[in-house]
């Protein structure tokens, strides 16, 4: 046997081109009908007695057996599966014109959406037995497109389950693999400050670590949420909570044990430790689903923005001058308002409170949403009593667009009952009104009783206006929420009673202006019974575009009871594209007339555009002077990293961060980008370096694994590898896999890889003639699957070949139309090309 190494970059002979063309053609759909062998009479090297019947795409006869097929049911594509096909009966041939029909069991038909209970013959059949579906179900039919390997099933609508648009069958939901995981987010900053107009100077170091660790075991999810902060040498470690949860699929609910928070639809949400059973609307299709808030603000300089909830820092980021938006808060809970702090580069701070509210309470007709809680109250990161309590919430959709809802909270020193009604008035919008009656025992055994009234409204207009009055709420002086009553009872001398809420209003308006952009207006106000001041904030802005130039104008106004004056900021921003680079300009001015201007460039780099960079230079009035910054953010396959430097007249700061995840599973330890809630582990043995589509920087590691983060639970997601990124010794049977993770699942996306040499053989028979065109060659190896078709002049291109083995070659059913090739590849071959060989088939 003679071997030659053929580099892919060199010109190939016509024989090589023919074989490679045959390989490529084999991957394309075939549309030919019956093939006439007479066309091959004058082609040298082709046996006129070769049996081509198996390649005739529309021939009436195909061999029964198991085929891997794509399944389409009533024009809806389902997942691919391996099915057994049997020869059609005469009646089936006459009815459907098919030579092969699928052998489908009762279970498989149910997975396809057939209403089994409507057909007694199906209901009585053994679960895995092949049934005559076309006889049992009137007008049912199948068509096997052999060329495309696609099974097309057709059933009358009356025989199908009535499923909503977007439904993913529960049989496809994947609880995932057992694994340990850690999702981390570390940030740090080192600053030096030396004021020119005073003798003040200092250095400041700050570090923050956010850890979400856990374990998946079957359907159970164990999670812990902890944070660590270090400010100027002072360390703080907070164990925010640990929980154990799982899906209860028959109830479309989620069971949680441990640290969690109550629902915030009817009562104010509070942190708790105990047992929770709540409806999980993610299990419903998109068309049947009924909010973490978006935080907007303006930074005067390169600033650090932190978000606190219940005195815990739950989010921290660094922003550039101008208007910013935070829309990726991790949904830890909906308990408590959010305190946002903007720390400017000169050390000054802005603070405002972002209320955490919901829209009008509505449910679809016949749909019940409920929550059950039992446990003890947790105050968060401050001292308070922790009484035991129970809570029940329920909302039910009635006919004619009505929704009725209510709930109750019971504790030794507190009880509350709530009831309300919501209505979708169509063009007018959605409105809900409710009242809550509460009785509280405060400090010194003092009893207090009162009511709270709430009005919620939301409406989107065809003109592009989205108007939401996310609440007007008024409470009498005797009304206390469960959290207020508990905190006041814990310490009557504290400032808790100062923030006894009286009324709250929040409104959001967004107007789309088509080609002219959009405007938004957000306003909140909250006042208290024991304080004359009011917490107020206003955000307004306009986003527009002229040609390829983007620009925006934003205004913020905030006022707190403890402040002598309000904070007011006005900003203007503009971005101009310069190829792959953007030129940016930002202008901000405050209530004292102090302005800050920034001019710079930003863009992306690298093949996957996963390196973001920006360079800014600025100047501030009123003695602020020059400032500038450089920022880099890299999103790699095993994590993300950021690095920034900024300076002004009074000091300089370096900030940096690392974000990512680690998963330990049965096939190795895999590093990842930040994980999110649900994710997939790609398993592609031997495909090291292969890139994952639509996930910048993610590629398969040396163990054949990669993590695709941030999957949507209970939704089908396509996970794909870039075929052009595979090395020359790896081939894929399919470049994409569909997965449907449950909440918190780590699902396996397994790719069937063929790892080995790519070989081009010139095959001759023992009599010296070339092996006939159209013969099939199959690798005889129990651990590998590889096959191909012989081209003209006996040329065979086949991939995934081991260094040593044998091929079985067939071009007919007779013994004389079969032979075997034993081969041994050279011990050393690089992986940049195709190995050529001359071999005798015996």
Predicted feature locations:
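A short, amphipathic beta-strand motif
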Residues: 71, 297, 680-684, 757-765
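Short Pro-Gly-centered beta-turn/loop motif in secreted/extracellular proteins
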Residues: 95-104, 329-335, 705-731, 792-815
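Short, ordered, surface-exposed loop/turn motifs in non-cytosolic proteins
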Residues: 63-88, 686-696, 767-782
């Amino acid at each position: 046997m003679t071997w030659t190494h053929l580099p892919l970059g060199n010109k190939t002979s016509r024989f090589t081109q023919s074989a490679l063309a045959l390989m490529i053609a084999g991957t394309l759909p075939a549309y030919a009908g019956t093939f006439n062998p007479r066309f091959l009479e004058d082609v040298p090297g082709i046996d006129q007695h070769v049996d081509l019947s198996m390649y005739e795409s529309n021939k009436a006869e195909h061999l029964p057996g198991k085929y891997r097929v794509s399944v389409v049911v009533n024009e809806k594509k389902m997942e691919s599966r391996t099915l057994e096909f049997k020869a059609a009966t005469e009646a089936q041939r006459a009815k459907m014109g098919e030579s092969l029909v699928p052998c489908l069991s009762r279970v498989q038909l149910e997975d396809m959406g057939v209403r089994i209970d409507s057909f007694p013959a199906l209901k009585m059949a053994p679960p895995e037995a092949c049934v005559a579906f076309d006889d049992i179900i009137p007008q049912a039919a199948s068509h096997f497109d052999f060329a495309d390997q696609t099974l097309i099933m057709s059933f009358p609508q009356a025989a199908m389950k009535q499923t909503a648009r977007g439904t993913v069958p529960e049989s496809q939901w994947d609880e995932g693999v057992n694994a340990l995981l850690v999702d981390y987010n570390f940030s740090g900053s080192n600053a030096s400050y030396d004021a020119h107009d005073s003798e003040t100077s200092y250095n400041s170091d700050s570090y923050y670590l956010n850890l979400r660790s856990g374990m998946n075991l079957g359907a159970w999810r164990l999670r812990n949420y902890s944070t660590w902060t270090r400010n100027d040498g002072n360390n703080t470690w907070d164990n925010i909570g640990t929980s154990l949860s799982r899906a209860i699929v028959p109830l479309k609910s989620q069971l949680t044990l441990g640290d969690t928070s109550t629902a915030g639809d009817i009562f104010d949400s509070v942190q708790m430790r105990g047992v929770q059973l709540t409806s999980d609307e993610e299990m419903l299709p998109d068309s049947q689903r009924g909010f973490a808030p978006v935080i907007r603000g303006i930074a005067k300089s390169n600033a650090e923005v932190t978000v606190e909830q219940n005195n815990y820092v739950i989010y921290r980021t660094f922003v550039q001058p101008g208007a910013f938006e935070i829309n990726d808060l991790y949904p830890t809970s909906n308990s408590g308002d959010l305190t946002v702090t903007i720390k400017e580069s000169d050390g000054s701070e802005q603070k405002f409170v972002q209320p955490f509210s919901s829209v009008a309470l509505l449910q679809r007709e016949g749909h019940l949403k409920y929550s059950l809680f039992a446990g003890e109250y947790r105050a968060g990161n401050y001292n308070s009593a922790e009484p035991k309590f129970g809570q029940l919430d329920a909302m039910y959709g009635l006919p004619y667009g009505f929704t009725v809802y209510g709930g109750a909270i019971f504790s030794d020193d507190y009880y509350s009952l709530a009831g309300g009604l919501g209505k979708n008035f169509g063009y007018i919008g959605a409105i809900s009104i409710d009242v809550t009656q509460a009785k509280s025992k405060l400090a010194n055994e003092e009893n207090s009783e009162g009511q709270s009234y709430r009005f919620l409204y939301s409406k989107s207009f065809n003109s592009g206006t989205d108007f939401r009055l996310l609440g007007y709420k008024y409470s009498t002086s005797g009304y206390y929420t469960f959290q207020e009553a508990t905190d006041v009872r814990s310490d009557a001398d504290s400032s808790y009673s100062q923030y006894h809420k009286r009324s709250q209003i929040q409104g959001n308006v967004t107007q789309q202006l088509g080609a002219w952009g959009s405007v938004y207006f957000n306003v909140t106000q909250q006042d208290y019974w024991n304080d004359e001041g009011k917490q107020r904030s206003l955000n307004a802005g306009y986003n527009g575009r002229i040609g390829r130039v983007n620009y925006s104008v934003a205004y913020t106004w905030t006022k707190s009871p403890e402040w002598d004056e309000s904070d007011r900021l006005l900003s203007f921003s503009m971005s101009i594209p310069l190829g792959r680079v953007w030129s940016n300009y930002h202008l901000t001015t405050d209530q004292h007339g102090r302005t800050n201007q920034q001019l710079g460039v930003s863009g992306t780099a690298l093949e996957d555009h996963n390196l973001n960079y920006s360079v800014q230079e600025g100047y501030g009035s009123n003695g602020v002077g020059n400032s500038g910054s450089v920022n880099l953010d890299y999103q790699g396959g095993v994590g993300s990293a950021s690095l920034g430097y900024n300076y002004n007249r009074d000091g300089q700061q370096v900030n940096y961060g690392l974000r990512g995840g680690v998963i330990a599973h049965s096939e190795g330890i895999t590093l990842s980008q930040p994980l999110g809630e649900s994710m997939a582990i790609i398993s592609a043995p031997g495909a090291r370096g292969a890139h994952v589509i639509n996930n910048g920087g993610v590629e398969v590691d040396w163990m054949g694994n990669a993590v695709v983060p941030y999957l949507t639970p209970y939704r089908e997601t396509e996970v794909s590898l870039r075929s052009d990124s595979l090395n020359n010794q790896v081939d894929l049977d399919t470049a994409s896999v569909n997965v449907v993770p449950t909440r918190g699942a780590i699902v396996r996306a397994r790719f069937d890889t063929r790892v080995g040499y790519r070989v081009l053989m010139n095959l001759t028979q023992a009599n010296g003639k070339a092996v006939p065109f159209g013969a099939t060659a199959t690798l005889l190896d129990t651990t590998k699957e590889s096959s191909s078709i012989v081209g003209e002049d006996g040329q065979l291109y086949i991939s995934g070949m081991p260094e040593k083995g044998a091929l079985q070659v067939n071009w007919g059913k007779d013994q004389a139309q079969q032979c075997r090739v034993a081969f041994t590849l050279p011990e050393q071959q690089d992986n940049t090309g195709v190995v050529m060989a001359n071999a005798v088939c015996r």
